[in-house]
Swiss-Prot record:
Protein name: Inorganic pyrophosphatase
Annotated binding of Mg(2+) 1, by residue: 66, 71, 103
Catalytic reaction equation(s): diphosphate + H2O = 2 phosphate + H(+)
Cofactor: Mg(2+)
Length: 176
């Protein structure tokens, strides 16, 4: 959970959500938010010669079934510093699983007032195939050289499913 944070998922959630960025785009360092120390720490350096294609973080005030907040990949044109908060609009879900089980990611874009470039992305079909391929390729391969780790991407789902995942995770957090 994210008990040290005094912010939640956002007043407009699940349509617009707060995302705490852990990993900036173009980074090969995997950062994670340390809930005890309330700081972003280095988790590991990627073993592959790859970088995160976009900014990556989580929605505070949410709880997935695996005990972690909802993961979010924010499609954007600039890196956002670790620990920063960005308001984002969920547009899709990337379904995947790894060595620990299901590990889907919500895919979002910055709120239009922050960056209008992606305002036309409302649903999974609005994301260009080239971007979806880039995202899928990254998640399929970024753990390849790590012993005992693997990832399999199983598909894409629409914005409505992303919002339902967020809605359930907010309720789960409130009940915890």
């Amino acid at each position: 959970m994210t008990g040290c944070l005094k912010i939640g998922p956002g007043d407009e959630a699940p349509d617009v959500v707060n995302v705490v960025i852990e990993i900036p785009m173009n980074s090969s360092v995997k950062y994670e938010f340390d809930k005890e120390a309330c700081i972003v720490k280095v988790d590991r350096f990627l073993y592959t010669s790859m970088v995160y294609p976009f900014n990556y973080g989580f929605i505070p005030g949410t709880l997935e079934e695996d005990g972690d907040p909802v993961d979010v990949l924010v499609i954007s044109r600039e890196p956002v510093a670790p620990g920063s908060l960005i308001e984002a609009v969920p547009v899709a879900v990337l379904d995947m699983e790894d060595e620990e089980g299901p590990d889907s990611k919500v895919v979002a874009v910055p709120k239009a007032k922050l960056d209008p470039l992606f305002a036309s992305y409302k649903d999974v079909g609005d994301i260009p195939d080239a971007l979806k391929s880039k995202i899928k390729h990254f998640f399929e391969h970024y753990k390849e050289l790590e012993p005992g780790k693997w990832v399999r991407v199983t598909g894409w789902r629409p914005a409505a499913d992303a919002k339902e995942i967020i809605r359930r995770a907010i309720e789960r957090y409130k009940g915890a």
